[in-house]
Every structure is written in structure tokens, then in C-alpha cells.
Amino acid sequence: MLKNSLNMGTGSITLKNDFRVTNFGKFLRKTKINELPQIYNIIRGDITLIGPRPVLEQDWKLYPDSILNRIYEIKPGLTGIGSIIFRDEESILTAVKNEDHQEFYKKKIAPYKGKLEIWYQNNQSMSVDLKLIFLTALVIIIPTNRFHENFFQDLPERDF
């Protein structure tokens, strides 16, 4: 991302082919190499391997209070169900034509991500965590896969 990118374009929302993302940044994001420094945070105990992804404060405020209170109960993670399902978030937001991207994120994406994190809390187990680790590796290799639908049939329904 470019310096001061939060004050340009769509702010904290990144669209497909966003002018703020450099070519090198696109490579890092696509391969998820940009996440390697988070391993240090896992070792320090600041985050876990599986859990809700940390978000910027301005995006955090978009989540309904009832969901925020639940998400606060567990440590953030390097990957999780939201990371897998929203692997293509940039494409989803880019496809939005008749609505402001921030508004769409607030009305549709943030509440659904919150429901996914609550689903994770309600179903947290070694088995679920191992499946999420496996699925994370798969979405890096095959970004368009929908294998999570085979592993987790009881996920909240998505209305967009």
C-alpha cells in the first residue's frame, strides 16, 4: 500500500486492482507472504493461530455491539473462518455497483463476518481448528475454492 493510503480512495476498503496497492504488494497479498510477520505475534502470545482477524479501529466500529462483545471474548488470530470465506473480499466489494462500498461493508460484510466469528466460538474445537488450518492452505493455493462448504455445512447463511 502507498503511504497515507487510508486517506485515499476507498479508505480501509481495498478493491480489486486498487491503485494504492503496488505490484510487489499485490504479490505479497496474493501469496499471503505479508502475513509471515504475524508469526512473531503468535510466539509473543498477542494473537493465536486461529481466531477472528484483527481489524482497523474504524472497521471494528462497523460491527454490531452484540457481535463486538462476543468477539472480544477470544484472542484474534492469524486465520479463521472469516479469512477463508472472505478470501475474495476485494472482488466482492469491486462487484458492488449501486451502493457505496463503505455502506455495503457496514450493512452486509461486517455483520456476516461477525456471525461467522460467533459460529467459530460456538463450534471451537481441535477438529475445527485443524480444518481451518487445512482450508487456509487450500485458499492460498486455490483461491476460488469453496471447500469450506463441504467441511462446515452449518455456517450462517450469506445473503449477498
Positions of PLM-derived features:
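Conserved small/aromatic sequence motifs within transmembrane helices
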Residues: 1-160
